[in-house]
């Protein structure tokens, strides 16, 4: 468990930024990483809120290699961050839920937007830590639209843009 408060994590981030160190809960910055059983028990008995983290065995020097079905072979640094698995309210984080859900739903291929590609190292680490088979990944480019008011490119919005909905094409007779 990690008992760090939001204020402590904020101070940690500020110190990392000031020292030009990769931000996040890792290595020597992960102050709850090596708490003794007695310390953990005392904090829980004192009612101190906590999250559950995965102690990452990753190293910045190591690389993760994977074949993306669209982008081809990709090399990225290993994840070194001790990712939160369960929030203090007991709700799993997106990343942990992604691994568990994909495993139990027998997902073999994950097809998603390229904005998620930076999460692959942490997802591979989570799948392996849980003993799950790592799915194949395919990262698609974002569908962009030129904003009529500004002329800028932006993501197609299912709330703002009617052509993002199937009904738009059905009504148009396509």
Predicted feature residues:
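Active-site cores that bind ATP or allylic diphosphates and position pyrophosphate for catalysis
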Residues: 2-159, 163-171
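Conserved phosphate/anionic-ligand binding catalytic regions in large, soluble enzymes, centered on
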Residues: 174
């Amino acid at each position: 468990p990690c008992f760090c408060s939001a204020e402590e994590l904020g101070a940690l981030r500020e110190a990392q930024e000031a020292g030009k160190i990769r931000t996040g809960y890792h290595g020597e910055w992960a102050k709850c990483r090596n708490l003794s059983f007695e310390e953990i028990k005392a904090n829980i008995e004192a009612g101190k809120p906590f999250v559950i983290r995965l102690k990452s065995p990753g190293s910045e020097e190591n690389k993760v290699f994977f074949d993306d079905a669209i982008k081809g072979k990709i090399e990225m640094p290993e994840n070194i961050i001790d990712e939160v698995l369960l929030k203090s309210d007991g709700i799993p984080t997106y990343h942990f839920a992604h691994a568990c859900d994909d495993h139990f739903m027998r997902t073999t291929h994950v097809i998603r937007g390229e904005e998620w590609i930076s999460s692959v190292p942490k997802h591979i680490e989570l799948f392996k830590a849980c003993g799950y088979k790592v799915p194949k990944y395919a990262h698609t480019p974002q569908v962009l639209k030129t904003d009529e008011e500004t002329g800028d490119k932006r993501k197609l919005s299912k709330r703002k843009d009617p052509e993002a909905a199937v009904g738009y094409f059905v009504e148009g007779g396509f």
